[in-house]
């Protein structure tokens, strides 16, 4: 599931065979209704779970960070974001208060609170049939590619991410099919086959669902980064 700036919530649901059962958009109430209707689920949320707690400021933490990092002066972010940024992965920085957070983050915080009320437990929890965790779409695609993805939201970026999902085994259209449908006439007349290309928010929701699939069925192919106090992010660790 993804909370973003333009469309509050985009969600995807897949099963243990990777079949896509749902892919849609909606408001918080729609996401709440969708999650409330699940009796057994592992939800991956593409949004910060909480504000930063100042871990990066702590002396014992800073001693463990790279002394030569260009991020040395950054302190208003979570440790997990610092670690991802240090690897070169572009991720948003979470402020130290909800008031300072952008609207899409506030919606994400609210969703996590609602999940708790619905009886979802933080992953991993062997005693709960409904669990959730935080993931990060850009970082997930980076891990699967082994390098920085093309610009998020651009046509080439969406096609690249769709190809990553296809190669990972997700039942999405092979992105190369897009090029097979282009002719000189169609290009000149604005008739590109855009209906076969997933949007950036849909791709983030699908990679979140894929990460949940791996976490639930092949946990050895998932890595986690961060600290429990501020939030741990789970990412696929099986390059295509």
Walk through the language-model features, giving the residues of each.
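RNase H-like (RuvC/DEDD) metal-dependent nuclease/polynucleotide-processing core
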Residues: 1-240
